[in-house]
């Protein structure tokens, strides 16, 4: 009888603890991915600064335009922003996709923990200014895509403009860091 009471109490305690622990793990994965997105942002911006000051920015911008995907094709103000993506597991491969090779080139020198590059990464770069616009970092998906792209996107996360809010990204554990988040802290109108 006493064993049944103890087992009943343990079942109740586990019933309360397991969902809380699961939510904590989910939140910690999201925060880690957000932190990694910021790290990728800073590394990519450092690399782009090196290319701009080194005089080879025009060649890199042309490569980004040819290999990348236009992030906002319907927004006239953001026509010059192109996305470069690296799929999970692609970093360790000898041959990478065109934009995956560019992501590797931009991040490889400034990222010391190379295991961070084994994720779905998207760098959005403004080819007019030569600045990084935003970075997505996901470990719980097979890739990142835009809704205007054709193809099979099973297991991938959509990264359109309306999917960038905190709650949507938290549900998917998708890390994100953007110049809009850092530059527009105060409304000066």
Each predicted region: which residue ranges?
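N-terminal single-pass transmembrane signal-anchor helix
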Residues: 1-21
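Compositionally biased, intrinsically disordered low-complexity segments
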Residues: 8, 45, 67, 75, ...
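Small side chains
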Residues: 8, 20, 44, 120-123
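Aliphatic-rich helix starts adjacent to a transmembrane/signal segment
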Residues: 11, 20-41
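Alpha-helix exit/C-cap motif
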Residues: 42-70
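Acidic, glycine-rich loop-and-strand cores that form catalytic or ligand-binding grooves
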Residues: 61, 67-116
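Short, surface-exposed interaction loops/tails
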Residues: 113-189
């Amino acid at each position: 009888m006493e064993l049944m009471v103890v087992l009943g109490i343990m079942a109740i305690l586990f019933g309360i603890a397991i969902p809380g622990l699961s939510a904590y793990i989910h939140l910690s994965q999201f925060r880690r991915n957000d932190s990694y997105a910021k790290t990728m942002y800073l590394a990519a911006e450092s690399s782009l600064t090196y290319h701009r000051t080194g005089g080879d920015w025009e060649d890199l911008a042309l490569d980004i335009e040819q290999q990348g995907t236009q992030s906002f094709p319907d927004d006239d103000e953001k026509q010059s922003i192109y996305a470069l993506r690296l799929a999970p597991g692609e970093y360790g491969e000898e041959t990478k996709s065109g934009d995956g090779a560019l992501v590797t080139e931009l991040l490889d020198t400034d990222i010391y923990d190379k295991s961070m590059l084994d994720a779905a990464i998207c760098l959005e770069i403004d080819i007019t200014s030569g600045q990084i616009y935003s970075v997505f970092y996901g470990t719980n998906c097979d890739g990142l895509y835009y809704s205007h792209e054709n193809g099979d996107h099973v297991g991938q996360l959509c990264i359109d403009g309306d999917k960038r809010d905190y709650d949507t990204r938290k549900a998917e554990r998708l890390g994100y860091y953007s110049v809009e988040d850092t530059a527009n802290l105060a409304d000066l109108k």
